Amino acid sequence: MKETNSFSQKLKQFALLFFPIFVTQMSLFAMSFFDTTMSGHASPIDLAGVAIGTSIWIPVSTGLTGILMATTPIVAQLVGSKKKEDVPHVVIQAVYLAICASFVVILIGLFTVTPILNGMRLEEPVERIAAQFLSIIAIGIIPLFTYTVLRGFIDALGKTRTTMIITLLSLPINVVLNYVLIFGNFGFPKLGGVGAAIASAATYWCILIITVMIIRTKEPFASFNIFKQLYRPSLSSWKEFLKLGVPIGFAIFFETSIFAAVTLMMSNFSTTTIAAHQAAMNFASLLYMTPLSLAMAMTIAVGFEVGAKRYNNAKQYGFIGIGLALAFALLYSILLYFFDDEIASIYTTDIQVHHLAKEFLIFAILFQISDAIATPVQGALRGYKDVNVALIMTLIAYWVIGLPLGYILATYTDWAAKGYWIGLIIGLAFGATFLLIRLFQVQRKYTTQNSRS
């Protein structure tokens, strides 16, 4: 990152931040995408089992990686304020937290996964695949969480192209392992959805190994000497980190778990409905990688400018990110409307699943505008280290408004499973409105301070 003077310079620098992040997020998502699509072509039961497994795994993993994402704004502000010498201590303490969090998640999972799945009253084959999926994916928790911290450090320096290269190097491993293990090619046993979990866990370890090697040997990362000194664990540092990270993590958890909760509630419907819902939700999540990538770029850009006390520049980056997100939302809405049949065909050859997935995809169009506002706005707020109000807003929008309304519509109207999608859409719209108002308040506060000084 460097200081910019004109709007065009900011737009160019933001694009250079965003594009590698976008490729990285798409590549990471591609692992889940290939898990879902390839499992779906194995059988509808495998697709449903992976759907249930990921609906439990994704909120946990994204919520905790969200906590660890606090590395990015902290390091970005340190670099912006020319405090490079403080960076190694922050990163190592975050790595310690990541490892501790990994063991806690694994321990809790040992005692909770089976009761949760038993309580869902799934068909026996679906429950078995979901349980095996979760047991195996746990092997990849430690590398995934540790990589999240190290990626936050790399991205905070504005070197988002590096994380892009790391992920692109790892993606082919995931695809090949999926092909071999899901379908039983080259003499390996046919494992179906369980093979997808093995492939993802192995890929997470590959990503971590590559990242550590780059940080140790390549500039500008090597000059920070991140691994030169293993600092003693510092509870005070953990407390400061968690003060920022926990609201970020829970805000992400509330947003992602609402979709997972809907998937779990879909267990009351048929396997066909679960599979169709998962297919449509998976593609909607694919499109979500764009506003998410814009949000991550905004955290870096806004955090850097706030650290340097250039608050007007930070405000301009906010407008750039939201504007780009709305433009992409329009493009994706057109794509969903005109190519719903082709999109559904990617996920399944089953006629009933295909038809129902097309109906769900139409609802995904309405997700686009809300995501284009809410997600980048949260990225900007993280750059300001303003996270507590966003946490409360997301809780209310998704869990107080969206999910209860969806349940009512699905249970007491003819909308059935589609009622959950309508509830999600309304919850997302409220969340986008609340968060945008908060961003304006924060920007006004900082620009007022700037004018007074």
Curated annotation (Swiss-Prot):
Keyword field: Antiport, Cell membrane, Ion transport, Membrane, Transmembrane, Transmembrane helix, Transport
Entry's Gene Ontology BP terms: monoatomic ion transport
One of the Pfam families matching this protein, by short name: MatE
Residues annotated as transmembrane: 13-34, 49-71, 92-114, 129-151, 164-183, 193-215, 244-266, 286-308, 317-339, 359-381, 388-410, 420-442
Cellular component annotations (GO), alphabetically ordered: plasma membrane
Protein biosynthesis is among the record's keywords: no
Protein function: Multidrug efflux pump.
Family listed: Belongs to the multi antimicrobial extrusion (MATE) (TC 2.A.66.1) family.
Name of the protein in its database record: Probable multidrug resistance protein NorM
